[in-house]
Amino acid sequence: MQPVVETLSGLERRVDLAISVADVEKEVQAQLKRVARTAKVPGFRPGKAPMAMLERSHGPSVRYDVINSQVARAFEQAVEAAQLRVAGSPSLEPKTEGVDENTLAFSATFEVYPEVAVPDLSDLAVTRYETEVTDAEVDKTLDVLRKQRASYETREGRAAQDDDRIVLDFAGTIDGVPFEGGKAENFPFILGQGRMLPEFEEAARGLKAGDTKVFPLSFPEDYQGKEVAGKTAEFTITVKEVAEAVLPVVDAEFAKSLGQADADVEKLKADIRGNIEREVKVRSQGRTKTSVMDALVEAAKFDVPKSLVDNDVQGRIAQAREELKQRGVPNADSMPMPAEVFAVESERRVRLGLLVSELVKQQQLQAKPEQVRARIEEFAQNYEQPAQVVSYYLSDRQRRAEIEAIVLEDNVVAYVLEKAKVTDEKVPFDQLMGMA
């Protein structure tokens, strides 16, 4: 008789399972005989130990495995007969009431996948982001490259300004008491690069070699030095040297120093533009993808299995702990990480994943081999040896699968953009790159 599947609530189901004690014992004896051929029992040659002794030493573990195997088989048969897609693993509880001695009975509680209805994509409102790369962006990048290769010349009587290299002594106290890391001699830094706190840089700006200045400095609440975070210190600085940055001329020699094989300035600028355009494309597409995925998940109106959400939460907690360990945070494995902190985002990820999977299946948006190769080749252009990068990804199934997942998402985004209400938005370059 086919087991009856009971609907508890939402996606939760329950089914009663029964297996024969005789079938269990038959399988247990068969496995014990196989164990007997190789089991090492003191005082007996292999294969000669009495079955009663093997029953005592191996019987419980063999019986446990056999029962688990037969219950799992009964569960698979029950959900297959009911044509259910199980999400996660079932929770099993033994049943004794109304069960005869020849039967082992269990109650299996589990969740099923929801019926995923793809929303009407024409109702979605999404934004497609675009950013133009102009000569100004190329020139800014050239300036950054020049500053990275700057030399410095000491200027007597020069008032310190941005991009100058300053060498100074500093000493700080809090309530008159020195603190760790608050003192240094002949300390160099480039003014305006943000290496020092803004108040420190502002105090140094305009000073000349030989000048001394006393000023208050408030450490931010989230400052990395916990012993001074949120406190106000008094600093004394004495400038030893002010050196002006001397930038290299953009010429053939400069181009060659940056790896431009032909030492051609115009080719160097073209290379820079190409690199910027690739980065702009990645960031613009990333913003557009976020807009599309946000619209999809907002329109996804179906329940999600709690077991899948819980699995995602645990995965994210494990990932967070691993990241903390890599950053050298002590006791990362025992640090409290409440599941509810991750639950909302995990539910969103699961819901979006189910919807995207259904959309891919319905519209056949799977990544094609030629798309994967093209994406790898495009990505490889960011490296000095693109052919090696292409081979690196194509030769390994797991690495190739990573690119396939990206291409699949690209296919979904492209399909949604064809159907949805799209607003094109121009994003200023500095804003896109996080510089504004």
From Swiss-Prot:
Disulfide-linked positions: none
GO molecular function terms noted in the UniProt entry: peptidyl-prolyl cis-trans isomerase activity; protein folding chaperone; ribosome binding
Matches recorded under InterPro entries: PPIase_dom_sf, PPIase_FKBP_dom, Trig_fac, Trigger_fac_C, Trigger_fac_C_sf, Trigger_fac_ribosome-bd_bac, Trigger_fac_ribosome-bd_sf, Trigger_fact/SurA_dom_sf
Principal EC category: isomerase
Compartments, as annotated in UniProt: Cytoplasm
Protein family: Belongs to the FKBP-type PPIase family. Tig subfamily.
Domain notes: Consists of 3 domains; the N-terminus binds the ribosome, the middle domain has PPIase activity, while the C-terminus has intrinsic chaperone activity on its own.
Record-linked PANTHER family: TRIGGER FACTOR CHAPERONE AND PEPTIDYL-PROLYL CIS/TRANS ISOMERASE (PTHR30560), TRIGGER FACTOR-LIKE PROTEIN TIG, CHLOROPLASTIC (PTHR30560:SF3)
Name this polypeptide is given: Trigger factor
